[in-house]
Design a protein with these regions (language model features):
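Structured soluble/peripheral alpha/beta segments that form catalytic or ligand/cofactor-binding pockets
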Residues: 1-187
Length: 187
């Protein structure tokens, strides 16, 4: 990764290698864009699973009573400056300030969305949880408000996102998250 050039290493590994081998190590970007009247919303999650070698993403659009979604999974590469998952790409144009989301080459969706921060990122307290002496969560997250511009095209038609009529929130989290467990019997 180009980031190996920077003095930011926390272990003797390259930046793309987690410090622990737990398969539940993750890094997630989450975005929600709302039309201020409530007529439409767009959501996106993009999750890197470096110890599994995978990246997955979900993109959804709600208009009125209609919801359409696109689920994707792909091989995770070592490059982190522009992250892609199938037809979806996340570009970090100015860290903590300006990010771009594009969907290109898919038959049902296309998108070009620019997120710009309107607030500083607010870091939440670290969350650590154990289950029977095993760490199931150890994660950090920050949240941020922003503005959004761009277009989303799907089978429902075209949405034009602009700063006057839309608002945006996002978060970025990383660490270990084992996720909820299903019990074999009801408790």
């Amino acid at each position: 990764s180009i980031f190996d050039e920077y003095p930011i290493h926390q272990t003797s590994e390259t930046i793309d290698r987690p410090a622990v081998s737990d398969p539940n190590v993750y890094e997630r970007f989450y975005f929600t864009f709302f039309e201020k009247s409530g007529a439409a919303a767009v959501g996106l999650t993009l999750t890197l699973h470096p110890n599994r070698g995978l990246v997955d993403a979900a993109f959804g659009v709600t208009t009125g009573r209609r919801y359409e979604s696109l689920m994707m999974s792909d091989v995770l590469t070592s490059e982190r400056e522009n992250i892609s998952c199938g037809p979806l790409r996340l570009e970090i144009l100015e860290p903590m300030r300006h990010l771009r989301i594009t969907i290109d080459g898919h038959t049902d969706f296309s998108a070009s969305i620019d997120y710009r921060a309107t607030s500083p990122a607010i870091r939440e307290d670290r969350v650590t949880r154990s289950r029977e002496r095993r760490v199931v969560q150890d994660r950090t997250r920050y949240a941020q408000c922003g503005s959004v511009t761009g277009t989303v095209v799907g089978q429902y038609g075209e949405l034009v996102l602009n700063e006057n009529n839309w608002t945006a929130v996002r978060d970025h989290s990383w660490g270990i998250w084992d996720g909820p467990k299903q019990h074999t019997t009801d408790i």
